[in-house]
Amino acid sequence: MEKLTILLLVAAVLMSTQALIQEKRPKEKIKFLSKRKSIPESWWEGECSGWSVHCTQHSDCCSGECTGSYCELY
């Protein structure tokens, strides 16, 4: 009887630990995704250039495409 009680207690602890771990994961994903800005926010704050603006590298453009020294449309 004592062995069964101990086994049930261990199982309960393991299940509650697993539930806590799974509960924290979605919060971490939300924090990661919320740190990223949308393309319009980046453009509005001047972090990237819009369409048909002079550029020197892909990262200069909000679309990520610098072709022929000008930003491409998305």
UniProtKB/Swiss-Prot annotation:
Keywords: Disulfide bond, Knottin, Neurotoxin, Secreted, Signal, Toxin. Residues 20-46 form a propeptide. One of its GO terms (cellular component) is extracellular region. Transmembrane segments: none annotated. Disulfide bonds join C48-C62, C55-C66, C61-C71. It holds the Pfam family Conotoxin. It comes from the Eukaryota. Expressed by the venom duct. Residues 1-19 form the signal peptide. Its main location: secreted. It is found in: Secreted. InterPro entries: Conotoxin (IPR004214). GO terms for molecular function: ion channel inhibitor activity; toxin activity. Belongs to the conotoxin O2 superfamily. The presence of a 'disulfide through disulfide knot' structurally defines this protein as a knottin. The cysteine framework is VI/VII (C-C-CC-C-C). This is Conotoxin VnMEKL-0222. It comes from Conus ventricosus.
